[in-house]
Amino acid sequence: MASLGRRRGVPVNRERGVMAATECYIVHEIYNGENAQEQFEYELEQALEAQYRYIVIEPTRIGDETARWVAVGNCLHKTAVLAGAACLLTPLALPVEYSRYVALPAGALSLACATLYGISWQFDPCCKYQVEYDSQKLSRLPLHTLTSSTPVVLVRRDDVHRKRLHNTIALAALAYCAKKIYELYAV
């Protein structure tokens, strides 16, 4: 596909085997014109949609933006799960007359985070990736071919269970909150 101007990952001999070219894509930091930043973004978007197992991002600006985007998605997911768990477990830990003051806001926060994640991140191809920090896993990648000393490495992970978890907990928190609000105003 070199005729289309796309650069693919380089197969590298390793102790554990050869990494296939379809497993790793490198967004190289090569400035060849005034639209280099748009070219980097386009390459990253193409790599995300092609679902490479590893994506190495050399350009610092795009790498940092992508890492922040992934971190915000992770934060929303964790907040939805933890706030939902707090909503559901607070009635077990606090007296009934006080539990609603913690459980209802926690349930609302869980639902808000799960909804925001569903609207903003669910259909983004970047949500299937996590930033890789494990040096042992990074050593298997062709990082020696890079010009940047601090690339961002994304690894594709299945997020079906993660989405099910935070959606289930958020819906359970919603059901609990709806029940408590009904009890408060029905009496």
Curated annotation (Swiss-Prot):
Keyword set includes Membrane: yes
UniProt xrefs under InterPro entries: TMEM11 (IPR026120)
GO CC terms: mitochondrial inner membrane; mitochondrial outer membrane
Gene Ontology biological-process annotations: inner mitochondrial membrane organization; mitochondrion organization
Keyword field: Membrane, Mitochondrion, Mitochondrion inner membrane, Transmembrane, Transmembrane helix
Keyword Transmembrane part of the UniProt annotation: yes
Membrane topology, record value: Multi-pass membrane protein
Cysteine pairings via disulfide bonds: none
Membrane-spanning residues: 80-96, 103-119
Subcellular location(s) of the protein: Mitochondrion inner membrane
Pfam family, any one: Mito_morph_reg
Family classification: Belongs to the TMEM11 family.
Entry function: Plays a role in mitochondrial morphogenesis.
PANTHER family named among the record's database cross-references: PROTEIN PM1, TRANSMEMBRANE PROTEIN 11, MITOCHONDRIAL
Name of the featured protein: Transmembrane protein 11, mitochondrial
Native species: Danio rerio (Zebrafish)
